[in-house]
Amino acid sequence: MTGDPKKLLYDFTAGMGAFASETELQGKQAAAFLDMVRINFEDSVLDFKTKELVAIGVALYHRCPYCISLHAFCALEAGATKEEIMQAAMVSVAFGGGPSMSYTVTLLKDALETFKSETFRKEDREVILKRLGMA
């Protein structure tokens, strides 16, 4: 396994908060980044769920463990099914080959199991949604 999906999600969201609070400039940079992401993920011609499925494919292609964990969580929050997520993942495998497949069958699989399990409590979900500005 390439990492604990829950820990990766907590570390990323905590890291963004810590980065933003270090200096005024970093606060502005973090806010600008998060605004750009928020705007790009708003419902438009493509809905939020579809955009999260695209993001999973991109994250797998680039082999970013933090991105894979984050977008697996967000896709589930948007109502994506495991089957939809795995099909989006397989599109990335068509372009990324073995490395994308490796992350699909390990980290993505673990993330889906983790975020749908009892070990990922309601409190965990609330903390992450608040940190992401989705609460």
Task: Put a short name on every predicted segment.
Residues 54, 58-70:
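Short, thiol/selenol-centered motifs that function as redox-active sites or metal-ligating centers
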Residues 47-48, 65, 82, 102:
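Alpha-helix N-cap/helix-initiation sites
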Residues 18, 49-59, 88-94:
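Alpha-helical scaffold segments that form or flank carboxylate-/histidine-based iron centers
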Residues 31-35, 48, 52, 56, ...:
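N-terminal, well-ordered alpha-helical segments
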Residues 65-91:
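Mid-chain, well-packed structural core segment of small domains
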Residues 1-50, 103-135:
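Acidic, glycine/proline-rich low-complexity segments that act as flexible tails and inter-domain linkers
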Residues 90-107:
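Short Fe-S-cluster ligation motifs
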